[in-house]
Amino acid sequence: MEHSAGKTLVWALFFTVVLGGMAMAKDAAQMGVIVVDIQGDFTKLKNGSLAVDGTDEAYIKATEENTKKLKEAGYPIFATQDWHPKNHASFFTNHKGKKAFDVIKLHGKDQVLWPSHCVQKTPGADILLDKKLFKAVVKKGMDAQYDSYSGFQDDGGKKTDMDKLLKKDKINKVVVYGIATDYCVRATALDAVAAGYKVIMIKNLSRGVAPDTSQKAMDEMKAKGIVILDNLDLEKIKGN
């Protein structure tokens, strides 16, 4: 009898461990991470042409360390990368008589004119985090006529590979952070919600161009059901 009870206990423990592990693996497989535009031209660290405040060495280090934590927890990590041709329509230098941050109409929409940034195959376009962290890097902004703040599509509606990659991994929830809160993080998070994903945005792993527009962007995200966490907290992420 004791032998039989012992075997029963062993099997119970076995199934608890195995099934519990499978459940954890399933949870990990259903959540992905999108790290938005951690590139030289957007950072103070590299004296980028479009550097955002707060993007110093400490920020890059913290972002890399937290991304490693997520990878070690079993979550697939995807990066977005601005990847513009030299003649991109969003560069003020490609519009005679225009200055940086002027606003023009482009294809019927307001277009902010930016300093030249993240030009293909230049150091400013390089991702500053360890490339081995990423399962895939999704390039955006390659069409010279359309800007692409979102990691899912450009302003003309042309899709990137992001949605396809996430669906291939059966992901239904994404954690989003990076540069900039009020532009590419915002657009990527909102498009993720529109595509049917649950979204969590990490505030302290993101940096915005301006405090007022960053707050407005976060308010907009919250209104769409996006959960905003101040810090990366694996337990809170699993619970949302």
Outline where the language-model segments fall.
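Short, well-ordered secondary-structure micro-motifs
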Residues: 90-91, 148-151, 187, 212
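Bacterial N-terminal signal peptides that target proteins for export
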Residues: 1-11
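Histidine/lysine/aspartate-rich catalytic loop segments that bind and position anionic ligands
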Residues: 131-166
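Short, composition-biased local secondary-structure segments
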Residues: 156-162, 182-195
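Residue-identity detector for glycine
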Residues: 6, 20-21
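Active-site acidic carboxylates
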Residues: 23-141, 168, 172, 193-200, ...
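Glycine-rich anion-binding loop/nest that anchors nucleotide
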Residues: 171-187, 201-206
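Bacterial N-terminal signal peptides
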Residues: 11-20
